[in-house]
Design a protein with these regions (language model features):
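HIT superfamily nucleotide-processing domains
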Residues: 1-92
Length: 92
């Protein structure tokens, strides 16, 4: 499979991992657009959020809270963004 996220999760491409569990993998963006810019991706391959099942959606949502607390932004605030498709600015 030629998916950059799958390769990062498999360790084929190095990353700065900040969190991992059974369902998700979180790592720092290589071109951050904010002081804390972390990508949280499901370990199961999917093209975008529209392919996400309920279990994975819960796991990603729980990881958002864990990473926000870990990175020290849970009180000050943060954004959660999902880009879907060309018109939604999805680049991967």
């Amino acid at each position: 499979m030629d998916c950059i996220f799958c390769k990062i999760i498999a360790g084929e491409i190095p990353s700065d991992k900040v969190y991992e569990d059974e369902h998700v993998f979180a790592f720092r963006d290589i071109n951050p657009q904010a002081p804390v810019h972390v990508l949280i991706v499901p370990k199961k391959h999917m093209r975008n959020i529209l392919e996400c099942d309920a279990q994975t959606a819960v796991a990603v949502t729980e990881a958002v809270g864990k990473v926000a607390r870990q990175e020290g932004v849970s009180v000050s605030g943060f954004r959660v963004v999902t880009n879907c498709g060309r018109d939604g600015a999805q680049s991967v």
